[in-house]
From Swiss-Prot:
Recorded superkingdom: Eukaryota
Catalytic activity: mogrol + UDP-alpha-D-glucose = mogroside I-A1 + UDP + H(+); mogroside I-A1 + UDP-alpha-D-glucose = mogroside IIE + UDP + H(+); mogroside IE + UDP-alpha-D-glucose = mogroside IIE + UDP + H(+); mogroside II-A1 + UDP-alpha-D-glucose = mogroside IIIX + UDP + H(+)
InterPro entries xrefs: UDP_glucos_trans, UDP_glycos_trans_CS
Role: UDP-glycosyltransferase involved in the biosynthesis of cucurbitacin and mogroside tetracyclic triterpene natural products (e.g. siamenoside I and mogrosides IV, V and VI). Cucurbitacins have cytotoxic properties and exhibit deterrent taste as a defense barrier against herbivores. Mogrosides are nonsugar highly oxygenated compounds used as high-intensity zero-calorie sweeteners; they also possess pharmacological properties such as regulating immunity, lowering blood sugar and lipid levels, protecting the liver, and acting as antioxidants and antitumor agents.
Tissue specificity field: Highly expressed in young fruits 15 and 34 days after anthesis (15-DAA and 34-DAA).
Keyword DNA repair carried by entry: no
Pathway the protein acts in: Secondary metabolite biosynthesis; terpenoid biosynthesis
Species the sequence originates in: Siraitia grosvenorii
Gene: UGT720-269-1
Applications: C.sativus and L.esculentum expressing S.grosvenorii genes SgSQE1, SgCS, SgEPH2, SgP450, SgUGT269-1 and SgUGT289-3 accumulate siamenoside I and mogrosides III and V, thus providing a strategy for vegetable flavor improvement or for heterologous biosynthesis of mogrosides.
An example molecular function term from Gene Ontology annotations: quercetin 3-O-glucosyltransferase activity
This protein's name: Mogroside I-A1 synthase
List of residues binding UDP-alpha-D-glucose: S311, Q374, W392, N393, S394, E397, D413, Q414
């Protein structure tokens, strides 16, 4: 029997046939995001744009998330061709849904496939079948089910083209024995990867490849999911060509067609207006505190530091204290978003109230809210810096708004984004240590908000922001959306794929022999 693990990896190449519209049937597209806010939000924006273009859209979310998305009725009312369906995520109600905790990822990977198959069968038994599925690149089961039903698939990657490219270099790094790594240095440089010379570190790698102590099965599954996306007929990215040209070129050798529609939030606003019923306003999982906008109105231009760590990050009480005192010590006014669940085993509001009493200046300098409309805050003229976890949505939104960043990455694509923000694009500062201390926070704030470095960073940011917004003003990033409409299949006939290589094959088959090799098991 042929040993597939012994394949010549240098000859691997996959080319799906292009999408081929083929009948008079009205297109009906189903969108299925991974159930995390950073994924749901861009998917909703895309759903709006497709609906506005006249395509009937079914937006599929987990039951848990659907309950948390506020006012979906308003979205459905504004976009009559936008419909919502739900699916269980397979977890108990009190189970953590944080991606870093693992259970949600494994449940979505393994548990939702039968339910997704049933949903597609039910929809296709009706008068108006699904003609195309746009799936999150982190979910491979929709691709498998789509192939069973003969439905074309488009993959949507909510992260950067750069971070996606890293996934496709993982088999090479495993084969070379560079990962899993043997020592305890999580920020050691990865050698010999094209496009990343001197810029790729271990903590930039996806999944637990960046964490020696973590369960490596998470990484196997994650890479396997991504490689499966190679079977999709096209790829959608929330980026623009000038921002990531080398990585888009690399991905074009893997995917048959790529749509770059970023900055997606700015495109949506330009096309649909700044409405309270837009995805940007409705996809938050916490109630927005609008009082912060009035507070910003009273601050001098470019004086405020906006602090937000996204929808999933948690910190310890002492880490929150260090952040608070670092912000206060900087002497800069700040608007800080702290979710009620941001502190592990504690209540953020109580801690903040206690610290504000201890440090009287804090109440005068800053404002704390549980949640804010990030796009609106970043666009406010009073905001001069963004202390961020460097998620891709936050990065793109900050670039579009022209706001320099202070990078405090935690996991996933965030460390890689932070390195590019600091060392490549030069539009922010990256923390140079892994400590949570007030001095580091104070130094970062001052570095970004004062002196010559501030001038240089702001100049670089203005150039990049201009490029991003030119796409919106001139409608350049709308062109791929129009092309996407044209290319959206109007029939459920699945284009025949020609498999010339292993793109999309099971990940364990690619590296099975290498995983067992001594280079990967040394202590």
């Amino acid at each position: 029997m042929e040993d597939r693990n012994a394949m010549d990896m240098s000859r691997i190449k996959y080319r799906p046939q292009p999408l081929r519209p083929a009948s008079m049937v009205q297109p009906r597209v189903l969108l299925f995001p991974f159930p995390a806010l950073g994924h749901v939000k861009p998917f909703l924006s895309l759903a709006e744009l497709l609906s506005d273009a006249g395509i009937d859209v079914v937006f599929l979310s987990t039951e848990y998330n659907h309950r948390r998305i506020s006012n979906t009725e308003a979205l459905a009312s504004r976009f009559p061709t936008l419909h919502f369906e739900t699916i269980p995520d397979g977890l108990p109600p009190n189970e953590s849904r944080a991606l870093a905790d693992g259970p949600l990822y494994f449940s979505m990977r393994e548990g939702t496939k039968p339910r997704f198959r049933q949903l597609i069968q039910s929809l296709n038994d009706g008068r108006w079948p699904i003609t195309c599925i746009i799936t999150d690149i982190m979910l491979s089961s929709p691709i498998e089910v789509a192939e069973e039903f003969g439905i074309p698939v488009i993959a949507f990657c909510p992260c950067s083209a750069r971070y996606l490219s890293i996934h496709f270099f993982i088999p090479k790094l495993v084969e070379e024995g560079q990962i899993p790594y043997a020592d305890d240095d999580p920020i050691g440089e990865i050698q010999g990867v094209p496009l990343f010379e001197g810029l790729l570190r271990r903590n930039h790698l996806p999944g637990s490849w960046s964490d020696k102590s973590a369960d490596i099965s998470f990484s196997h599954g994650l890479i396997n999911q991504t490689l499966a996306a190679g079977r999709a007929s096209a790829l959608i990215l929330n980026t623009f060509d000038e921002l990531e040209a080398p990585f888009l070129t690399h991905l074009s050798s893997i995917f048959n067609k790529i749509y770059t529609i970023g900055p997606l939030h700015a495109l949506s606003k330009s096309r649909l207006g700044d409405s309270s019923s837009s995805a940007s306003a409705l996809s938050g999982f916490w109630k927005e505190d609008r009082a912060c906008m009035s507070w910003l109105d009273c601050q001098p231009p470019r004086s405020v530091v906006f602090v937000s760590f996204g929808s999933t990050m948690k910190m310890k009480a002492d880490e929150l204290r260090e952040f608070w005192y670092g912000l206060v010590s900087s002497g800069k006014p700040f608007l800080c978003v702290l979710r009620s669940d941001v502190v592990s085993g504690g209540e953020a509001a109580e801690l903040i109230e206690q610290m504000a009493e201890e440090e009287g200046a804090g109440g005068k300098l800053g404002m704390v809210v549980e949640w804010a409309a990030q796009e609106k805050v970043l666009s406010h003229p009073a905001v001069g810096g963004f202390l961020t976890h460097c998620g891709w949505n936050s990065t793109v939104e900050s670039i579009a708004a022209g706001v320099p960043m202070m990078c405090w990455p935690i996991l996933g694509d965030q460390p890689s984004n932070a390195t590019w923000i600091d060392r490549v694009w030069k539009i922010g500062v990256e923390r140079n240590n892994r400590e949570w201390d007030r001095l580091t926070v104070e130094k970062m704030v001052r570095a970004l908000m004062e002196g010559q470095k501030r001038v240089e960073i702001q100049r670089s940011m203005e150039k990049l922001s201009k490029l991003a917004n030119e796409k919106v003003v001139r409608g350049i990033n709308l062109h791929p959306t129009i092309s996407l409409k044209k290319d959206t299949p109007t029939t459920s006939e699945h284009p025949r794929h020609e498999f010339e290589n292993m793109r999309g094959m099971n990940y364990e088959m690619l590296v099975g022999n290498a995983i067992k090799s001594p280079t990967l098991t040394k202590k």
